[in-house]
Design a protein with these regions (language model features):
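Conserved hydrophobic positions within beta-strands
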Residues: 51-53, 85-88, 143, 171
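Sec-dependent N-terminal signal peptides
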Residues: 4-15
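Conserved active-site neighborhood of the chymotrypsin/trypsin-like protease fold
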Residues: 55-128, 133-137, 152-155, 165
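N-terminal activation segment of mature serine protease catalytic domains
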Residues: 19-63, 72, 97
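Active-site region of chymotrypsin-like
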Residues: 29-38, 103-111, 135-186
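Short Gly/Pro-enriched turn/cap motifs at secondary-structure boundaries
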Residues: 24, 88, 160-162
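Positively charged n-region of N-terminal signal peptides that target proteins for export
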Residues: 1-4, 20
């Protein structure tokens, strides 16, 4: 009888500890992550990927390769709302990142706060994937390496298992602030 009670109790504690590892800020932050769909000049889908808002007035980030050769682009929020990309503000082919403005259909959109300081090697990090589901499984890991690029910017190497569909998702610190954008490993 004791063996039968120990197994369910151990499983319950294991599940509880897994839930406890998901930071409290995830539920609110996941609403800032969206899907990106780009179209060619014939209005055929060119690419799909992810992105996220960094300001409540529609400023967003994603990977540049999604937009390469695109005639137009739209974003689709976790709630299923579609909004057009109205303006490209900057792009970097080398680091595969693009900054753009979305023509938002509301007064404001959920946005992530950008971290003011770079996380140190060994710091906890979470990657927040796009999800239309109520539950979300963020991926946790650690900062393995921090390199400075172009003087003031940082490039991070993380110990984190990432799937292909997780490219261009925000990488967050323990306070729920975004400090990076996930990219394919080279």
């Amino acid at each position: 009888m004791k063996k039968l009670l120990i197994l369910p109790l151990a499983l319950f504690l294991l599940v509880q500890s897994g839930w406890a590892q998901t930071p409290k800020w995830v539920e609110k932050a996941k609403r800032a992550v969206f899907s990106v769909v780009t179209y060619d000049k014939n209005d055929k889908i060119l690419n799909t990927g992810n992105g996220f808002f960094v300001s409540e007035d529609g400023l967003a980030l994603s990977d540049y390769s999604l937009f390469k050769g695109a005639e137009r682009a739209v974003i689709i929020t976790a709630e299923g709302k579609q909004m057009p990309v109205s303006l490209i503000l900057g792009a970097d082919d080398m680091y595969d990142v693009i900054k753009f403005r979305v023509a938002i259909t509301e007064k404001k959109v959920p946005a992530l706060t950008v971290a003011n300081t770079a996380p140190a090697v060994g710091a906890d990090a979470w990657m927040l994937p796009y999800s239309t589901q109520k539950s979300i499984a963020c991926v946790s890991g650690k900062v393995k390496e921090v390199s400075k690029i172009a003087g003031e910017y940082h490039y991070y190497t993380l110990s984190m298992q990432m799937k292909d569909k997780m490219v261009s998702c925000p990488v967050m610190n323990v306070e729920g602030q975004v400090f990076g954008i996930s990219q394919k490993s080279s």
